[in-house]
Structures are given as C-alpha cells and as structure tokens.
A protein has these predicted regions:
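Bacterial N-terminal signal peptides
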Residues: 5-15
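SH3-family beta-barrel domains
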Residues: 21-41, 52-56, 63-78, 82-107, ...
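Second-shell loop/turn segments in exported
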Residues: 44-47
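N-terminal secretory signal peptides that target proteins for export/translocation
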Residues: 1-2
Length: 155
C-alpha cells in the first residue's frame, strides 16, 4: 500500500513539474531557443515587434512572467516581451568586455591557453566556481573568467 502511494505521488509530481517550470522565480537566466524570436513592446502578438533575435543560444535574463509571455533583458540591456515557448532553460553566455580573452585548460590564470575568443561569441555555460566558468563554443571548450561572461552568476 505504501509503495503504491509513493508511486502515485511520484507520478503526480512528474505531471505537475512542467507547469511549475514556467512559473520560476524571477529573475532567471534563459537562452533563445528559436532561429528567429520577436521581441515585442508588450505581452501579446498584438503589440509591435521592437527587435528580432536571430541567434539561438543567446542568453537573456527573464525579469517578469505573464501567462505565456516573458519580459526579458538582453546582453545590451534592451527589454521587451517574448513568447515563453521560444526560450530554453539551458544556460548559455556571451563573451563581453574589450578584446580577446582566453579559454584555458583549467580554471587557473596560469593554465595553458586552449583558444582565444572575441567579445560577442555565444556558447554553452557549464559550472562556475571561484571566478571561472566552463564554456563551450561548438566542439571547443575550456575555462574562462566569469567576469568576461554575460549570463553567468546570479541574474
């Protein structure tokens, strides 16, 4: 009887979780899922398109939730409304700052340099610790200073 009850509770938890995933506490990080994403001036398809993103994986900060819409802030600080289903909970980041920065073999300033990346490069964000983050661009990855990434750390 207890096993059946636990199984039922587990099943109910699985069914309820996707609905709650859309109601996360803001702010939180997300990435652009679609090949093309319209940012609107309000939370409806009736509002004017203010900007079109054409960069899957671009990190955004979700700052407000309204039904199927999310108010986002992009790396340039621009804000607008997008359809929630076109965002992914996957973590990504974009290289910021001036000039190239290094992707290193290990999370240490004196670790060998594997690659150099330019500001504006978008990649997948891994774990961050002690000011360093795992960062992958295509099939190339390494460790990069957290301060050179927008999309890392607390939103």
């Amino acid at each position: 009887m207890i096993v059946r009850l636990l199984s039922l509770v587990s099943l109910l938890a699985l069914l309820v979780t996707p609905a709650h995933a859309q109601d996360r506490e803001v702010p939180y990080w997300a990435t652009v899922r679609a090949k093309e994403l319209n940012m609107r001036v309000g939370p409806s398809a009736d509002y004017k398109v203010d900007w079109v993103y054409r960069r899957p994986g671009l990190p955004v900060k979700v700052i407000r939730v309204m039904e199927g819409w999310r108010l986002i802030q992009d790396p340039d600080g621009d804000k607008g409304w997008v359809v929630a289903r076109l965002l992914s909970p996957d973590r990504g980041a974009i290289v910021v700052g001036k000039g190239q920065t290094e992707l290193r073999l290990d999370p240490e300033a004196d670790a060998p340099v594997k690659w150099r990346v330019e500001p504006g490069v978008v990649g997948t964000l891994g774990d961050c610790d002690d000011g360093w983050c795992e960062f992958t661009v295509g099939n190339r990855g390494g460790w990069i200073l957290e301060k050179r990434l927008w999309g890392a750390g607390e939103p």
